[in-house]
Amino acid sequence: MGFFMDTNSSAPNRKPDWLRAKLPSSPAYKEVRDIVDTHQLHTVCQSAQCPNMGECWSRGTATVMILGNVCTRSCTFCAVQTGQPTEFDIGEPARVADAVHTMGLKHCVVTSVARDDLKDGGASVWAATIRAIRHRNPGCGIEVLTADFRGVAEHLDIVLDAEPDIFNHNLETVERLQRPIRRTA
């Protein structure tokens, strides 16, 4: 049995329901957008052009991306802008903590761009952000999704010493595909 398409039909091919995304219109979506804008934050949702942004923001959640929105690497699988980032913003950890408080989150997720231009790869900013969230939002679970810090264990220890509740790092692919897929990741 084959699949045949009626090329004479004027009816458009419709996507299946599970593939269609609704335009974001909920009050929660607007509220998250306003909080992100007011606190001058970046989200991986926006920077990586995530197709699920409308769904997540409509549920009142977003993944904050610290250390700016320009990555020092240019991974083939990622839509985040690459280049030479500007200086990191020392007020960012406090603004992230305030946004978590404003959103009333019981669990927050924070990620970042890779910052190979910084001596510690941004580990000290990670630690400051975790501590600021914890101080402003006691009881809020903190999940982090970090860059690899170029494999420098001391930089990783800086983040771990701040005691995030959940520590993540994406591998993206199997070992034999690391070089072709993740040349700089």
Question: What kind of feature is each model-predicted range?
Answer:
Residues 93-102, 106-108, 112-185:
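Conserved AdoMet/S-adenosylmethionine-binding subsite of the radical SAM
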